[in-house]
Amino acid sequence: MVSLSSLGRRHSSVIQMTLVALFVSATKLAGVLVTVTVAANAFSYNRFRKKFLHPFRSPIDESSDILAAFNVNPTTDGENEFFFGLATAPAHVEDRLNDAWLQFAEESPCDKSESPEHLQPADALMGSATADGGSQQASLSNKEGNRTVKKKKPLKIAMEAMVRGFEKYIEEEEPAPNDECHHNVAAWHNVPNPEERLRFWSDPDTELKLAKDTGVRVFRMGIDWTRIMPVEPINGLKEAVNYAALERYQRIINRVHLYGMKVMLTLFHHSLPPWAGEYGGWKLEKTVDYFLDFTRLVFDRVSDMVDYWVTFNEPHVFVTLTYCAGAWPGGNPDMLEVATSALPTGVFKQAMHWIAIAHSKAYDYIHAQSSASSNPIVGVAHHVSFMRPYGLFDVAAVTVANSLTLFPLVDSISDKLDFIGINYYGQEVICGAGLKLVETDEYSESGRGVYPDGLYRMLLQFHERYKHLNVPFIITENGVSDETDLIRRPYLLEHLLAVYAAMIKGVPVLGYMFWTISDNWEWADGYGPKFGLVAVDRANNLARIPRPSYHLFSKVVTTGKITRQERTRAWNELYRAAREKKSRSFYRAVNKHGLMYAGGLDEPIQRPYVERDWRFGHYEMEGLQDPLSCLLRFLLRPFSIKRKVKHQTDDAELVLQPLELSLE
């Protein structure tokens, strides 16, 4: 007869064996899942690499003394003329403008007296094509004393991450009162006369003369919607329109022509009237009707003076930063809107839909009201950046971001375009829910990776997709924030070489607009990043000081040529600074994991110049940089084909750091 104790031991043994079997099975299943996940991501990356990262042979003849020759002075009627231009925007340059940006900048989160339990966490941020930045967490009220409270603080992340609806919070100890206050707009409250911007409204001639003296043939400017319609036209346009302001714009546009330049006019450039922001702006259909009223007013007044029309500048950037992140004025999304922003029914696609409708209606009106002889040229300025994954598991994030931002807008309005405007500033390396700062890459002051090859790749991609439309491209914005001017000069030349190479490959590009003339207010980054060919002394009556890049740009514009000598000289100066371990300003905070915060800084940190060859056609992709990929690359290195890259130069001083290229 079996004892109860024996039965108990046997039962216990069976349970243990069962648990062990379950554990082993679970471990195997986990191993299979991990293997499948890694394999799937590796397969996805391999496809991505072949499609977007494949090496290409530059069509530029680098042995020639003349590397590029744009046809700025056609000798026969059949030749296509290439134009150069300079670009700016009302919110960047106009004084006496009580727009949403001024109100946003003047708001002081430090003045709010809220108890900790009522404090709302600031929205996470996204980097933007032209300039990154936005709101920060407000400090606690004074009545909290000096005690420390524990609260949630937003971990600011990148635009492409926020498009996908991510928001992260970290728990941390934070001193309650009297801390440094972070404003909605960085580097704004700590500079002289920030509200004056560049006084383009009261004194347009200073900027116009600087532009004219470079030799450019096109001047891109905008008309501010808020200035024309300071109040919502609920009771009709008569009581809502500032006709005197409209007349003033007409005189400014006439001044552009008197300086011998054509006009490219932008109707919406990241500045929504405050009254529209109060009711929801581009989330609602009635904004389409209001925008069409604005378009009619502008067109009816200045149509005979405008050569190119840009209805919208970078609409997906505006929608993302305003309605998905709340980092720009006029959005104020709640947590549900943020979390669902990238869904098919989310606020991103909702707002983009109404903007596409608004563009189409404006396009139809401009063409319908134009005479047959005037033949208006209407398009959009579409922001593109070259995105690549940092690690093996970031390919999906890049794919999703591209699917939302790269082609959908142009697809939706493709039959209502006379040209496709491309705004390109650089590359972005996606890591999880943020942008990774790659130590071996060069960056602008505002955190944009310098990558001229990306412009070439983007132009070829867009041409392949839209060549059936038979519409040309215009580079409506390209530039770099660089106060030292050492990066800007090679940046300018290399991106123009990228454009020229694309034209050799058959991409029809009509012109190139550089951003921008003088250092100005860069959205939520304030006056931190310096994008101008001309420096501005804000403490000395906004005195202008042309940088060396101003004269280089002028030379390229007037001759239409890029020479090997000019290229070598620009690179010598940059690499001398890199070899001497010099540093320059950087207006983007970076956390311990190397992720860039999207918010700007009131005062810059210092970052060294990077000794890397990013000339057009010379940049070498280093492969994935996450620990797993680096380990695999290290293990496979003995079996890889390696070659040392030697860089030829006419100047013995220019010695570039060789990179190893591993075939993966």
Please report, for each region that a protein language model flagged, where it lies by residue:
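Short, low-complexity, Lys/Arg-enriched N-terminal segments of secretory-pathway carbohydrate enzymes
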Residues: 1-19
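Short hydrophobic transmembrane-like helices used for membrane targeting/insertion
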Residues: 2, 14-15, 24, 32, ...
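Leucine-biased recognition of intrinsically disordered, low-complexity hydrophobic segments
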Residues: 4-7, 29, 33, 140, ...
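Terminal signal-anchor or tail-anchor transmembrane helices
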Residues: 16-47, 635
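Accessory DNA-binding and partner-docking regions appended to nucleic-acid-acting proteins
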Residues: 221
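Non-catalytic scaffold segments within catalytic domains of secreted glycoside hydrolases
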Residues: 41-217, 228-663
